[in-house]
Amino acid sequence: HSPDNNCLAIDVSDPVGIQMLLKQFNVKLVNAQKYIELARSIKSDDELICMKASIETAEKGMWLMRDKLQAGMTEEELWSYMHKVNIENGGEWFETRLLVSGPRTNPWLQECSNRVIESGDLVAFDTDMVGPYGYCADISRTFVEGNRLNDEQKRLYSMSLEHINHNKSLIKAGLNFREFAEKSWKLPDNCYDNHYPCIIHGVGLCDEWPLVAYPNRDFSNADYSANFEENMTICVESYVGEVGGKEGIKLEDQFVVTKDGLKQLSSFPYEIDI
């Protein structure tokens, strides 16, 4: 089909397939992920319907986890309720195992374990759930065992909520990533080294492009040249945890980009509002 172009983009293949391909054909292989994710970044109306179904299922699981949360159970026991609800409702799989409690909430990105949850612990999680129809529900919340935040937990929670609310208020179709990153909410110095890797990322069949990295001091750590476009679906991220601190707060919500701003797809309330 293209005799003068021997470049072939491949998404996924096993090693044997690659060996056979290179043996039989004179091709230059490149990673197809960035091209595929760019093509998937603008969602159709049908895709949004599928995504909303996945989010609805995820939030059922989140409510069940909040109802079941109690001191004496393990992180893995609590996390199992998310899997139960996803499978019961025709869902598929989870990208990660991000549910942690107490001191394991700081720093972020530790994997779910058999640690026993204690009275008053924060319990933070990221759904990363591929639900019904194969679309991802990517929502983060931080619960507290006993349903009552102490003063320090409230302080961290309020900062994380301010982080989310400020950043989501900036985004609309046409906004450049660099302008957004420059105007985005900045963590205090004692939290900077614990920052989440990105401010926002795309979401579809899994976590996808676009991605706006959490900026370093001179914005040299990533490519900020693209723009937000209408019907992109994105997640706005926040993690607030002081370096060396006891606990941390993880929040994340899912949105669709419009010409007038963001339309929120996730609806689970924040702990500070319940």
Segments predicted by a language model, with ranges:
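Active-site neighborhoods and metal-handling regions in enzymes and metal-associated proteins
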Residues: 1-274
